[in-house]
Amino acid sequence: MKLKSGSMVKIRNKINDIEPYVPGRSIKEIADAYGLKEDEIIKLGSNENPLGPSPAAVEAMERELESVHRYPESALTDLREAIADYAGVGMDQVIVGGDGADEIIDVLGRTFLEPGESFVVPMPSYMYYEYTLQAHDARAVHARWDVNENRLDLESVLDAVDESTRLVFLCTPNNPTGGLIDKKDIRAVLESTDTLVVVDEAYTEFAGVDNTDLLPDHENLFILRTFSKVMGLAGMRIGYGLGDPQIIEYMHRVKPVFSLTRLSHAAALATIRDRDYIKKSTEYSIKSREYLYSGLKKFPELRVFRSYANYILIDVRGTGRTAAELSEELLRKGIIVRDCTSFTGLDEYWIRVSVGTLEEDRRFLEVLGELVQ
């Protein structure tokens, strides 16, 4: 590749094939683009906690501010112990990442994938698996998530695994559809292969999903979780994984040493110890989800999917608009939702709406009604 300057700087061939990951626009970007005030904008596009962080986390970060000139902890022993207690596993089964669960995905790639090997993802699902692992010269193999039934097509996963497969990703609740994967199906995948099966439980609290009971009998199980959702720390970028101690030890060999900042460490530790906050956040988000679901079901123009996460997938083709068109109309009214056109396995007629405060939910339903009815 030749840069604009004419320099023959060598770029890896694989990087030329990767389309940049495009996250949702920020509140400031939307405000500037549409002439809106930032405090008027309702963000329902990124599956965040509408209640904000735990007060204990805020206090912990404030106390830690005077120490940010010091390097952070590397072993993270106290945080790993707290996560182990929360998840019901041993501390040697825990790894913590400093760019949310996305760092853990990258570490999985660096630990298990050789160039040319493959990983399996049922689509549609979280796009970052593929985005991250392609950079390791790995090959994505798509299995099928049955969108109409909102369930995993188990046979497609079993058929997709071959001798080149090193990782299988199963997201439950699935993002963006909100559907669950039955534990018997997870067990079937685990017992059909020696490949590492990564079960993404980023939204575990909203669904009561917990597959940690499968860990003792399946050393090829790895569970992926995050502090970005019910824990209310999306801006602090903290994720963690649970797995066999030997797998965790190998992953620690390639994980960045100081990736978790002092502030993130303090916030995560305070939050996971604040069980009242976690319970309150879980209950509120579920209440908001059910309020949104019942409100959306009243629109005959929409096909609304039952969700077990903190978001709802909606087929909007009955409105006569594409997802991009409806999302744009909502943006002009100060409401951000996720246009799901970029998700492999979905066409141009799907949006995903995150739970907000009940007042934000009411405003969204009101504006949506004005636009489509």
Swiss-Prot record:
GO molecular function: histidinol-phosphate transaminase activity; pyridoxal phosphate binding
Keyword Transferase: yes
Pfam families, alphabetized: Aminotran_1_2
Cofactors demanded by this protein: pyridoxal 5'-phosphate
Keywords for the protein's UniProt record, in alphabetical order: Amino-acid biosynthesis, Aminotransferase, Histidine biosynthesis, Pyridoxal phosphate, Transferase
Top EC class, one word: transferase
Coiled coil regions in record: none
Catalytic activity: L-histidinol phosphate + 2-oxoglutarate = 3-(imidazol-4-yl)-2-oxopropyl phosphate + L-glutamate
Pathway: Amino-acid biosynthesis; L-histidine biosynthesis; L-histidine from 5-phospho-alpha-D-ribose 1-diphosphate: step 7/9
Residues with N6-(pyridoxal phosphate)lysine modification: K229
EC numbers, comma separated: 2.6.1.9
Keyword Amino-acid biosynthesis attributed: yes
CDD domains associated with the record: AAT_like (cd00609)
Annotated GO biological process: L-histidine biosynthetic process
The family this protein is said to belong to: Belongs to the class-II pyridoxal-phosphate-dependent aminotransferase family. Histidinol-phosphate aminotransferase subfamily.
Protein name (record): Histidinol-phosphate aminotransferase
Organism: Methanothermobacter thermautotrophicus (strain ATCC 29096 / DSM 1053 / JCM 10044 / NBRC 100330 / Delta H)
